[in-house]
Swiss-Prot record:
It catalyses: Ca(2+)(in) = Ca(2+)(out); Na(+)(in) = Na(+)(out). Disulfide bonds join C537-C575, C543-C576, C859-C913. GO terms for cellular component: endoplasmic reticulum membrane; glutamatergic synapse; membrane; monoatomic ion channel complex; neuron projection; neuronal cell body; neurotransmitter receptor complex; NMDA selective glutamate receptor complex. This is Glutamate receptor ionotropic, NMDA 3A. Residues 1058-1109 form a coiled coil. Component of a non-conventional N-methyl-D-aspartate (NMDA) receptors (NMDARs) that function as heterotetrameric, ligand-gated cation channels with low calcium permeability and low voltage-dependent block by Mg(2+). During the development of neural circuits, participates in the synaptic refinement period, restricting spine maturation and growth. Forms glutamatergic receptor complexes with GluN1 and GluN2 subunits which are activated by glycine binding to the GluN1 and GluN3 subunits and L-glutamate binding to GluN2 subunits. It is a multi-pass membrane protein. It comes from the Eukaryota. It comes from Homo sapiens. GO terms for molecular function: calcium channel activity; glutamate receptor activity; glycine binding; glycine-gated cation channel activity; identical protein binding; NMDA glutamate receptor activity; protein phosphatase 2A binding; serine binding.
Length: 1115
């Protein structure tokens, strides 16, 4: 109300200040554009207005000890406000309606006799405001984004209303009809209302409303406590009664009697003046019914002794002729008292059947002291005052919406806005709208709303029918048998009293139920196997798989199964076992009931499809099954139509993928070490080789020309050879370094290579076997699922809770995955394991997926990602089933006593594939595909070797001649001894030829006594060269030392002095070493000359032989 006042004040200010308000309103976001008719919408202000009159609060009168048929029912009480004060409503912000309990008709005597009840006030104004607020939140109720407004009349003593600031509260209502008409015109009709809602409380006010509707041609809906009799049938004036129609109770009671073929009945009245006219008329119109006695115990109720004596006589007289007794006008206290007295003193004939004819409140129903087989009917929830007000307002809104689609101008623009100019010739908007009011039906808050005849708005409630029976524990319990909808009874699964004889095979004992249980195959909760040759199950429960959900077919199959002549085809028989079957057997044992088990015909859990529920849910709703036991997920949609027990198994949704054993690719042998490690190893190798070379050439003891006058040289290529040999473990001849630093560094490199090689070898086997790759999904929010690309395929089971979750949470994802959904979980697993696979990922309950992973012999399945959509498995039951509470209690006991843990260990104790110990042969048995990379590497090596050979020839023929011509590039000994020889080959050959031609001359010039010694004073490399053996005339190559003949110095020349460790010269040692070295060189020369002499002698012999042979031939 305060919010409406603020908006009215803002509108008035905007009228005074047009320019600023225009700027303010320009910033308000505009609503969506209206297609048509824009001019009409602008004229009516984008609102449909409904007037309201007779808004005085209703005060319910206290009930008398003896009720008339139109008395109101006692419900939840409210304190009546003090005179002159207003009740302050406190609605919940998210509530759809405000609950003010209506006093409807109920069993009399719910209070003590003579005790009054406090009066209660009902406030029509508040109910109207909340009805408008709730209906404006309903999308699509009115077309063109129209809103609903209420225009309330101003009544004396109620104060001014913000919706009508221009009206004066001082205008009192007159008692005569003409003054009332004038007041309605001046305060309500001028606002352009489409209809009027009224709350009359007397016959005179009803006549005033008749006058208003006839004169102004405006539809009026009167909300009354009970129907007022009317002589005229005015189609513009409708009345909606808050009282439950007596005819509804009569119809339900007659339907119950007809359903059970109880045509012979008697009546028992607790109140003499109770109205049973409608019931008697219905039974008299049907020739099958026969009314016996009418037992009126009104006068005998106060005295127990009188009541006992009277009932004993009456009940004995009717037990044979009319065994059915219908009770009217009795509250629960009186009913209990009657049955307690008759049972205590043994005057209750056991063959009597009892029916309560009055509607009962389910919350007031008790079982103590009541006989088994008692039938009652009533509503689970009681309608309240605000429900009827909102339904009346919605009736107007729906009629306007329908009329607008045909003639918008006539439906939206009221014809009567000035009472002085009433349209009488043409069709008015009120007359046009009344046609649609009479043909509008919908399901409202108070019941099914429709117009009966031409003046009555009927709110038909759906009644439930209960029967007092034994529960599985042997205790009395109210069991729902069915419901009364649309004038007929819709049966539930409960057993009607007269139908017990038709279910002899199902009920062998009155206290032991025989239920029909439906299941669905889902491992490990339900397995199936074939029956034996005799059609029996050595282990597990016998179940039928008839491939249908037709109740009559199942009845005939089970009847045949339990008969002596079993004609059920063997193909329909299966043996069911598993987690849920064990649980079902335990529940049946503890609750003492038998059951027949069958597999759901369509193989679905259940979903709303083509206007009905399928699968397990559909079988429960149609009464085909009394219980559904399998991995039945509890979700919101299913819980709204069926009952679930408390969860016996908690799970969530998961994602299943397939792992693929990939053969090691070409570069797999390098996978044990990261590429950064490989790079580091080869960089360290070459750095080590560089430092080895530097240390060796800088050391005085190194294997270099300057070191110890060695015949071999340690170059950079030698260092690389050592480093690679140590890294890869080659056993080849190498030239190790001679200096201490080089050897230390070489050993350090060997340690480094040992650790690298051991790490590589340790990881090589696992890598070469092949890596298991799979689709990496983080969960349901993974981009691969929300934005699938490159043919990524994923799905779930059709009509399962997983599909329902995806459809509600991610509609776009559901639309994509529909093409990949599968009929059942085994199909999805098979699609993953196929080669090639038909699915890349499968979404389903994680409990089912974990089991599939654990039994996968090939270890190809894996669950990935975070679990999502936590849910539980429960046992499904029909709505309002009496078994729900008992089974839930048993499940709680099973959990606390460890039975559920035992079931889990029994059916889930399978070694997970990831924890299996593989055989050694399975791991190390590798084929050529695992080493394909090494073979490729070897082939690449062959190719590179060919390229290297070609490169050598190119270097030898093109590059070396150019290097030889450059004097600065002649020395390559530090890099490669072989390269150095190749570059200096021409120089050595010239020296060798020069030595061969002149050595005889040199030796002939030496005197006989002259000692020829070599000049050893110069220790440089130029005077120490190797002899290169030539390949002349096919002889073997021998290396000799070539040096330049230098004239010997005087024998007394002082040798250069060398410093020893003590600082003195040691010339004796130097000369001694030089002589020994020269002697060894001379011995080598003698050996060479000797070989040449041998060759010369051999040649001479050959020539002489040749000469002798030639002479012989000439002669």
């Amino acid at each position: 109300m305060r919010r409406l006042s603020l908006w009215w004040l803002l509108s008035r200010v905007c009228l005074l200040l047009p320019p600023p308000c225009a700027l303010v309103l320009a910033g308000v976001p505009s609503s969506s554009s209206h297609p048509q008719p824009c001019q009409i919408l602008k004229r009516i202000g984008h609102a449909v207005r409904v007037g309201a009159v007779h808004l005085q609060p209703w005060t319910t009168a206290p009930r008398a000890a003896s009720r008339a048929p139109d008395d109101s029912r006692a419900g939840a009480q409210r304190d009546e406000p003090e005179p002159g004060t207003r009740r302050s409503p406190a609605p919940s912000p998210g509530a759809r309606w405000l609950g003010s309990t209506l006093h409807g008709r109920g069993p009399p005597g719910s209070r003590k006799p003579g005790e009054g009840a406090r009066a209660e006030a009902l406030w029509p104004r508040d109910a109207l405001l909340f009805a408008v607020d709730n209906l404006n939140r309903v999308e699509g109720l009115l077309p063109y984004n129209l809103s609903l407004e209420v225009v309330m009349a101003i009544e004396a003593g109620l104060g001014d209303l913000p919706l009508l600031p221009f009206s004066s509260p001082s205008s009192p209502w007159s008692s005569d009809p003409f003054s009332f008409l004038q007041s309605v015109c001046h305060t309500v009709v001028v606002q352009g209302v489409s209809a009027l809602l009224a709350f009359p409380q007397s016959q005179g006010e009803m006549m005033e409303l008749d006058l208003v509707s006839l004169v102004l041609h405006i539809p009026v809906i009167s909300i009354v406590r009970h129907e007022f009799p009317r002589e005229s049938q005015n189609p513009l004036h409708l009345q909606l009664s808050l009282e439950n129609s007596l005819s509804s109770d009569a119809d339900v009671t007659v339907s119950i009697l007809t359903m059970n073929n109880w045509y012979n009945f008697s009546l028992l009245l607790c109140q003499e003046d109770w109205n049973i006219t409608d019931f008697l008329l219905l039974t008299q119109n049907n020739s099958k019914f026969h009314l016996g006695s009418i037992i009126n115990i009104t006068a005998n109720l106060p005295s127990t002794q009188d009541l006992l004596s009277f009932l004993q006589i009456q009940l004995e007289s009717i037990k044979n002729s009319t065994p059915t007794v219908v009770m009217f006008g009795c509250d629960m206290e009186s009913i209990r008292r009657i049955f307690e007295i008759t049972t205590q003193f043994g005057v209750m004939p056991p063959e009597l059947r009892w029916v309560l004819g009055d509607s009962q409140n389910v919350e007031e129903l008790r079982t103590e002291g009541l006989p088994l087989g008692l039938i009652a009917h009533g509503k689970t929830t009681q309608s309240v005052f605000e429900h009827y007000v909102q339904d009346a307002m919605e009736l107007v809104a729906r009629a306007v919406a329908t009329a607008t689609m045909i003639q918008p101008e006539l439906a939206l623009i009221p014809s009567t806005m000035n009472c002085m100019e009433v349209e009488t010739t043409n069709l008015t908007s009120g007359q046009y709208l009344s046609r649609f009011l009479a043909n509008t039906t919908f399901r409202g808050l108070s019941g099914s709303i429709r117009v009966k005849g031409s003046t009555i708005v009927s709110s038909e409630n759906n009644f439930f029918i209960w029967n007092l029976q034994h529960d599985p524990m042997g205790k009395p319990m109210w069991t729902r048998l069915g419901s009364w909808q649309g004038g007929k009874i819709v049966m539930d699964y409960g057993i009607w009293p007269e139908q017990a004889q038709r279910h002899k095979t199902h009920f062998q004992h009155p206290s032991k139920l025989h239920l029909r249980v439906v299941t669905l195959i889902e491992h490990p909760f339900v397995f199936t196997r074939e029956v034996d040759d005799e059609g029996l199950c050595p282990a597990g429960q016998l179940c039928l798989d008839p491939m249908t959900n037709d109740s009559s077919t199942l009845d005939s199959l089970f009847s045949s199964l339990h008969s002596s002549n079993d004609t059920v085809p063997i193909k329909f028989k299966k043996c069911c076992y598993g987690y849920c079957i064990d649980l079902l057997e335990k529940i049946a044992e503890d609750m003492n009931f038998d059951f027949d088990l069958y597999i759901v015909g369509d193989g679905k859990y259940g979903a709303w499809k083509n206007g009905h529920w399928t699968g397990l849910v559909g079988d429960l709703l149609r009464g085909t099954a009394h219980m559904a036991v399998t991995s039945f997920s509890i979700n919101t949609a299913r819980s709204q139509v069926i009952d679930f027990t408390s969860p016996f198994f908690s799970t969530s949704l998961g994602i299943l993928v397939r792992t693929r054993d990939t053969a090691a690719p070409i570069g797999a042998f390098m996978w044990p070490l990261h590429w950064t490690m490989w790079l580091g190893i080869f960089v360290a190798l070459h750095i080590t080789a560089v430092f080895l070379t530097l240390y060796e050439w800088k050391s005085p003891f190194g294997l270099t020309p300057k070191g110890r006058n060695r015949s071999k040289v340690f170059s950079f290529s030698s260092a690389l050879n050592i480093c690679y040999a140590l890294l890869f473990g080659r056993t080849v001849a190498i030239k190790p370094p001679k200096c201490w630093t080089g050897r230390f560094l070489m050993n350090l490199w060997a340690i480094f290579c040992m650790f690298c090689l051991s790490t590589y070898t340790a990881n090589l086997a696992a890598v070469m076997v092949g890596e298991k790759i799979y689709e990496e999904l983080s969960g349901i929010h993974d981009p691969k699922l929300h934005h699938p690309s490159q043919g990524f395929r994923f799905g779930t089971v059709r009509e399962s809770s997983a599909e329902d979750y995806v459809r509600q949470s991610f509609p776009e994802m559901h639309e994509y995955m529909r093409r990949y959904n599968v009929p059942a979980t085994p199909d999805g697993v098979e699609y993953l394991k196929n080669d090639p696979e038909k699915l890349d990922a499968f979404i389903m309950d994680k409990a089912l997926l974990d089991y599939e992973v654990s039994i996968d012999a090939d270890c190809k399945l894996l669950t990935v990602g975070k679990p999502f959509a936590i849910e539980g498995y429960g046992i499904g039951l029909p709505p309002n089933s009496p078994l729900t509470a008992n089974i839930s209690e048993l499940i709680s006991q099973y959990k606390s006593h460890g039975f559920m843990d035992m079931l889990h260990d029994k059916w889930y104790r399978v070694v997970p594939c990831g924890k299996r110990s593989f055989a050694v042969t399975e791991t190390l048995q590798m084929g050529i595909k695992h080493f394909s990379g090494l073979f490729v590497l070897l082939c690449i090596g062959f190719g590179l070797s060919i390229l290297t050979t070609i490169g050598e020839h190119i270097v030898y023929r093109l590059l070396l001649p150019r290097i030889k011509n450059k004097s600065k590039l002649q020395y390559w000994l530090h890099t490669s001894q072989r390269l150095h020889r190749a570059i200096n080959t021409s120089f050595i050959e010239e020296k060798q030829q020069h030595f061969k031609t002149k050595r005889v001359e040199k030796r002939s010039n030496v005197g006989p006594r002259q000692l020829t010694v070599w000049n050893t004073s110069n220790l440089s490399h130029d005077n120490r060269r190797k002899y290169i053996f030539s390949d002349e005339e096919g002889q073997n190559q021998l290396g000799i030392r070539i040096h330049q003949d230098i004239p010997l110095p005087p024998r007394r020349r002082e040798l250069p002095a060398l410093r020893t460790t003590n600082g003195k010269a040691d010339s004796l040692n130097v000369s001694r070493n030089s002589v020994m070295q020269e002697l060894s060189e001379l011995e080598k020369q003698i050996q060479v000359i000797r070989q040449e002499l041998q060759l010369a002698v051999s040649r001479k012999t050959e020539l002489e032989e040749y000469q002798r042979t030639s002479r012989t031939c000439e002669s």
